[in-house]
Amino acid sequence: MEYGGVKMLKHGILGLLNYGDMTGYEIMTVFRDSLNYFWQAQTSQIYRELQGLEKNGWIKSTHIKQENKPDKNLLSITEEGKKELVAWLKDDNGKSFMRNPLMMKTFFRGECSIDENIDFFKNLPERETVFPEGTEKAKAISSEYQKYAPDPLKALYWKFTIDFGIRYEQLLREWSEQCIKTLEEIKNENTDN
């Protein structure tokens, strides 16, 4: 099966269900507190993918009746779903395609004034943050979920993604500062002439 360019959301959901059975709401909550830092998805997208995963036979749904509460559907990964997840994880033929709207806009920012661009770069780190609630909150959420991890070694990889996000934010701040410095130097040279 070819994975290059294929939407990754379904594999993210399979990965979450591989940790344990969940309802659609629980998947959305865990997704929001973990994968959403690097792979954004709307609730409607997740539910649409769940339907496709069930149709493919990669997950199954068990209807559970509850007293004094609405019934719920508990979702679990099937053996076929586990095989698909592992095949996707082992596939290293496809290159991760980088589509970065920030870089596209930066490439053409010469159409804006230096002052507008200085403002753009000053606001960039806050606007492009990976962790809107702060890195400490992200670390705390990751630590909380790690308590429920079926295997501490698997939870280590969650930490790796948090670390990547922290380093990305640091890189973005440093890069923005350098862009501002360069633009201010150009601005000062132009006013000196």
Residue ranges, per PLM feature:
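Amphipathic alpha-helical coiled-coil segments and their boundaries
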Residues: 39, 114, 121, 128, ...
